[in-house]
């Protein structure tokens, strides 16, 4: 005779998100001890999460709050649309802001209610049956502007931008956030670009020009022109503004009296 009731099964399912048979089996194994059954399902969930570790997490969302920006990944857009997944993401980004967590490790260790962010993600992963990954996190402690972009109306934001700046023109800072979202700047200034990357661009530009049969005396000018083009692609302040392509982002910021001190751009599934 079973030493548990249908109400026990229902309660266990509601608490853990486990299926009916898994809940029944846990209660049988626990000999009706409800707390032990919960523990058994947690252990089973942890094992399942481990098995999921090799599966890809190419979906998910970005979230921002009070200077914090996070990317939380799932395996499918079905989970990304899930209200509980989105609610947990909002709790995590709030925890990131409260803890001033500047990286994933710091955020995983941050408190969230009676547990940690890391355990909260593991519990949700076990409940919904997908691998979840806190992929990126950062926090800026200055004056910030944020922008979140949706790829589709029925999906949560997939691109998030955080801009730290000085100055009073919030609209200019917002325009820069839109710029970063659209044109994917990687660096703030030319000085931020690693020297080996610039050297490689110069080498490629020179070899390409030679292969095209350009005259030797023109190579220096051609190479410099192509490196300048590279800077305009990857350096925020060098980029033509999306609002006025006759001016650089730096020129428009100077006019607005705004200085960008740093920025971050997260896009779901992208490096």
Swiss-Prot record:
Subcellular location as annotated: Cytoplasm
Protein biosynthesis found in the keyword field: yes
Gene3D superfamilies noted in UniProt: 1.10.286.20, DNA helicase RuvA subunit, C-terminal domain, Elongation factor Ts, dimerisation domain
Pfam families with a match to the protein in the record: EF_TS
Coiled coil (residue ranges): none
Keyword Cytoplasm: yes
Alphabetized NCBIfam families for the sequence: tsf
The name this protein goes by in its record: Elongation factor Ts
Source organism per UniProt: Mycolicibacterium gilvum (strain PYR-GCK) (Mycobacterium gilvum (strain PYR-GCK))
Gene name per UniProt: tsf
